[in-house]
């Protein structure tokens, strides 16, 4: 099981496989720019043909719908959030020009609360629907 502090520090990088759900952390580095980090929770067998990771506490949910082609210039995350993409897709750009695309099933851990922040652009013909879960 992953300790919550290890999760926050992102101590378990992975290389996402084809067809594998992406869990991406975005955070502010010491250089004041946002950075990406791929993470994967360690899953433990439950004995009922399933696996489970340690609980990550959250409080409530916010459901947002973003119009196709919407852009949002450089901004910070409004707080620490786990963002679950249900439909549609979004490109997220960080300060060094790197762009990552999140689609249905992907999770973003948004922690870039200071510095330059990130920019987003909705892609595809359909709206993006995401669930935002505030994290402590």
What residue ranges belong to the model's regions?
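Short, Lys/Arg-enriched N-terminal segments with co-localized hydrophobic residues
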Residues: 9-20
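Short, conserved beta-strand element in jelly-roll/cupin
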Residues: 65-68, 76-92, 134
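A short hydrophobic beta-strand segment most commonly corresponding to one strand
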Residues: 109-113, 119, 123-136
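Catalytic-core "active-site belt" of small-molecule-metabolizing enzymes
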Residues: 20-64
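Conserved short histidine dyad/triad with adjacent acidic residue
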Residues: 41-46, 59-77, 112-115
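Short acidic-glycine-tyrosine-enriched beta hairpin
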Residues: 96-112
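Short beta-strand segments in beta-sandwich/barrel cores
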Residues: 61, 71-72, 89-93, 107
